[in-house]
Amino acid sequence: MRSDIVPGAIFPDYELSDHTAKRRKLSELQGQHPMVLVLSRGGYCPKDRRQAEGLVELHRELEVAYCRLVTISTDNITETNEYRTGVGAHWPFLSDAGRIVQKDLDIAEYTDPAHNPMIPHVVVLEPGLVVYKIYNGYWFFGRPTIEELRQDLRAVLSKCRPDWDITTPELKAAWQQGRKEFFYPYGKTYAQTLGEQD
């Protein structure tokens, strides 16, 4: 991983094609929410498929917690779509068949020249693509467990959600004064947030 991609740094706002061939920017997929970004070898790898299967259950929690999940692999669009469908995923999968991310982040898995994938990583991002934590998943147990991701997201949410603890006198007073910008969805209507879902 590039030496400047560390906690507190801004992660690059890559624009890639998703599993439907639609161009997507990471910042647009993230919106105002924390995000778990999975950098994957691809659907051919049994470790990556197992990881994605485990994330299916977590994704249901992420949706109700207003968090995002995105997977990027070096698969082409057809393989990306098949990978996503095959593991039963419902979050965006992006195709980096051109190895843009792999090269830019310096994460080519040189031990597998036949597939030329990325070294698997999981990056937990605060809103604004701010890096919170990076996991190197070359070995399967280097990847975060579902519980570790829950803990990471708890820490991120407690930092970025002004209404994390609504028992404070300040928040109670703000609510009574009609100052809803301190409460989710922070000045937007719930209908507006529906357009941000994927």
Model regions and ranges:
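Chalcogenol-based redox active-site neighborhoods
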Residues: 1-198
